[in-house]
Amino acid sequence: MVQIQTYLTVADNTGGKIAQCIKVLGGSKKRYARVGDIIVVAVKQAIPNSPVKKGDVHKAVVVRTSKEIRRKNGTYVRFDDNACVILDANLNPRGKRVFGPVARELRDANFMKVVSLASEVI
């Protein structure tokens, strides 16, 4: 579960390294974001000479969470970190690569481009 002020690793090659959640989108009272939810992030650390700069504000989709995800078949999946992929205005990934595994729940949230870029889907 990701809430406001949560730090996430950026799991793509846009140049951002660490981002901070500043808003969870999807209703005025929505407090937590799970895998597949869209959030607004501020980039806190970035690689020099990259398209994403420190201080930039972007939309992002959550691809991994430390809090376990319960699936319909009763199994639970959790990851070592909280991670996101930065999106453009059309909610497509800005980067061309996605690092690390992503959760299968992104398919249900219609982020097929993020799933196809990922090296592993769990």
From Swiss-Prot:
GO CC term, one of those recorded: cytosolic large ribosomal subunit
SMART domains: Ribosomal_L14
One family name in Pfam for this protein: Ribosomal_L14
Coiled coil stretches, renumbered: none
InterPro entries per UniProt: Ribosomal_uL14 (IPR000218), Ribosomal_uL14_bac-type (IPR005745), Ribosomal_uL14_CS (IPR019972), Ribosomal_uL14_sf (IPR036853)
TM spans (from-to): none
Single GO term (MF): structural constituent of ribosome
Signal peptide, first to last residue: none
Any GO BP: translation
Keywords: Ribonucleoprotein, Ribosomal protein, RNA-binding, rRNA-binding
Family to which the UniProt record says this protein belongs: Belongs to the universal ribosomal protein uL14 family.
Record NCBIfam families: rplN_bact
Function text: Binds to 23S rRNA. Forms part of two intersubunit bridges in the 70S ribosome.
Self-association and partners: Part of the 50S ribosomal subunit. Forms a cluster with proteins L3 and L19. In the 70S ribosome, L14 and L19 interact and together make contacts with the 16S rRNA in bridges B5 and B8.
Protein name: Large ribosomal subunit protein uL14
Organism: Borrelia hermsii (strain HS1 / DAH)
Name of the coding gene: rplN
